[in-house]
Regions:
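Basic polycationic patches enriched in arginine
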Residues: 7, 11, 25, 31-33, ...
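Cysteine-centered motifs
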Residues: 3-6, 17
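N-terminal Rossmann-like NAD(P) cofactor-binding subdomain of oxidoreductases
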Residues: 33-248
Length: 253
């Protein structure tokens, strides 16, 4: 998960947010030099901040040069509490909870306008039914708050770009069509691929020019990408699930 989100929070945002260090040329005598000029940081929020993936977002965003974490949102039962109170003993990361978020008051993710007013865009990692996730993410987009989603709900929405930046960065060109559908000027939803695809597609893509048309792929998954442990998922203790139905078709699509 750490490797997945590290790629997600570096390369993916390069294409979606514009790299915040932009090259500028200036002439010094007869020589032309290229320098890096520091651009603004983006104020960002995490929706689903108390869950495992939300916690990982928080650790990755700590002291980040591009992003300033200013809003944490979760379910109504966490809203109004400090982040430290809301998470309690459920902090699952190996590193300590960042001091910068401990006293931040958690917002209700359903209060879209309140969250959207504080940020340039949000990262979304909520644990809800897919139709509820779709509705929530589009609500943020319609509030003119771009959504970068770790969820799978919009991966097959035709006008939502699913980006593996080394392969299909140009897919963000579909965003104007999505904005037209949603009636937005700035808001949109963009998603990452599933963890399996983003691990092997970058390696396979360059081989296409050599005529390779079919590949047999076997993946070996961790216990859970959602934070389940042996205690909360006893079926996996001393066990292996040899086949997970629907995964092949999902990846082929």
């Amino acid at each position: 998960l750490y490797c997945i989100l590290c790629r997600f929070s570096s390369r993916f945002f390069y294409y979606l947010c514009k790299f915040p260090w932009e090259p500028h040329r200036y002439k010094e005598g007869y020589r032309e030099r290229k320098v890096l000029v520091r651009m603004k940081q983006y104020n960002v929020g995490v929706i689903g901040a108390t869950g495992m993936v939300g916690q990982r977002f928080i650790t990755l965003l700590e002291n980040h040069p591009w992003f300033n974490l200013v809003a944490l949102a979760a379910s109504a039962r966490s809203a109004g509490k400090t982040y430290e109170e809301a998470v309690g003993s459920r902090w699952l990361m190996k590193t300590p909870m960042p001091e910068s978020v401990k006293k931040m008051v958690v917002l209700d993710a359903a209060n879209v306008e309140e969250v959207a007013a504080k940020v340039d865009f949000v990262f979304c990692a909520v644990n809800m039914k897919k139709d509820e996730i779709k509705a929530l993410e589009e609500a943020y987009a319609k509030a003119e708050c771009p959504v970068v989603s770790n969820n799978s709900a919009h991966r097959f929405t035709p006008d939502v770009p699913m980006v593996v930046p080394e392969i299909n960065a140009d897919h963000i060109d579909i965003i104007p069509a999505q904005r037209k559908r949603l009636g937005t000027k700035r808001g949109f939803v963009a998603v990452k691929s599933n963890c399996s695809l983003q691990s092997y597609v970058p390696a396979l893509h360059p081989l296409r020019k050599y005529g390779i048309s079919d590949v047999l792929v076997c993946t070996y998954q961790a216990i859970s990408g959602a934070g389940k442990t042996f205690e909360t998922f006893p079926d996996i203790l001393d066990n292996v699930i040899p086949y997970i139905g629907g995964e092949e078709e999902k990846s082929e699509q």
